[in-house]
């Protein structure tokens, strides 16, 4: 499965303490689209959060997620590459 498109929707944070940097939509093989991946700045660096839902007991469960580390790295790399391309001076890439 190949990533054929990555679209970044930056979040303009007026509050500098906000951790959310962007929402991402990824297209696979021009036939499957995954919406609402989030780019988050945490204490240890920047990472992606897959689309999730809050359960009745308050836990968050991923709706969809990579099942192995190598694909997660491919996905994260494609997202960060596009983010940096669109925001070269606004992003210090320190991955978690």
Curated annotation (Swiss-Prot):
Q: Which UniProt keywords apply?
A: Cell cycle, Cell division, Septation
Which InterPro entries would you find in this protein's record? SpoVG, SpoVG_sf
Matching Pfam families, A to Z?
Answer: SpoVG
- What does this gene product do? Could be involved in septation.
Which family does the entry's similarity section mention? Belongs to the SpoVG family.
Return the protein name.
Answer: Putative septation protein SpoVG
* Tree of life domain: Bacteria
HAMAP family linked? SpoVG
- Can you supply a Gene Ontology BP term from the record? sporulation resulting in formation of a cellular spore
Name the source organism.
Borrelia duttonii (strain Ly)
Q: Which PANTHER family match?
A: SEPTATION PROTEIN SPOVG-RELATED (PTHR38429:SF1)
Q: Which gene encodes it?
A: spoVG
């Amino acid at each position: 499965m190949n990533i054929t498109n990555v679209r970044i929707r930056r979040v303009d944070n007026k509050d500098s303490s906000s951790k959310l940097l962007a929402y991402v939509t990824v297209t696979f093989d021009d036939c499957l689209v995954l919406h609402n991946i989030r780019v988050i700045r945490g204490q240890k660096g920047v990472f992606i959060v897959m689309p999730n839902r809050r359960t009745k007991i308050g836990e968050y469960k991923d709706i969809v997620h990579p099942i192995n580390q190598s694909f997660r790295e491919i996905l994260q790399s494609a997202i960060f590459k596009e983010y940096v391309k669109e925001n070269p001076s606004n992003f210090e890439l320190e991955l978690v």
